[in-house]
Amino acid sequence: YTRGDKKIGYLVYNHFTPGPNGYSDRTYDEEMKKIFAGFQAQGVNEFVLDLRYNGGGYENSANMLAGLLIPEASRKKVFAVFSDNKGQSYSNDFCVETKGTAGYLKLNSNRIYILTSQSTASSSEVVINSLNPFMDVILIGELTEGKNVGMEMQKNDKYEWMYWPITLRVTNAVNYDYSAGFKPDIEWNE
């Protein structure tokens, strides 16, 4: 979309999945890089990310999307901090391998608009939280769910069962806790 000197990019993203065949398939992540290369080629300088219907998914895909959006000066900063109930924690930096694509979206401002709803949760909230310390994140919509926890699959092949217990609490580079959800800057109900 073009409005005056603004070239506005819009992306709706409904689930953080790297590819159709699970974690090791990166088909969708690679397609996302191509989409962002297109935004870059079109000179997009404002961006709207629609996460209203995104309940989460894989953290690596969320990191990849946030890495495409983060300002250049913040590319090697902390994306998220994961802490377990034993007091152990580790962090992931923003990361994207561009491999021949135009790469990151270079906005003329350090601002992004993100559309939210009550269904915006988990990895979607991690994206919001990870960008907050490094750019002006303007939320439009409804209060998000507040799911700031992560899970790890536990599997028993002998009895053919698996479960996903909550094992991690997720914060950002400044240790922000969003368990009550993110309140929108501009409230808007669909």
Walk through the language-model features, giving the residues of each.
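Beta-strand-turn-beta hairpins that frame and shape the catalytic cleft
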Residues: 1-10
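C-terminal "post-core" interaction segments
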Residues: 11, 15-24, 33-34, 38-46, ...
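P-loop NTPase catalytic core of nucleic-acid-dependent motor ATPases
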Residues: 49
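Short strand-turn motif at the edge of the Rossmann-like AdoMet-binding core
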Residues: 52
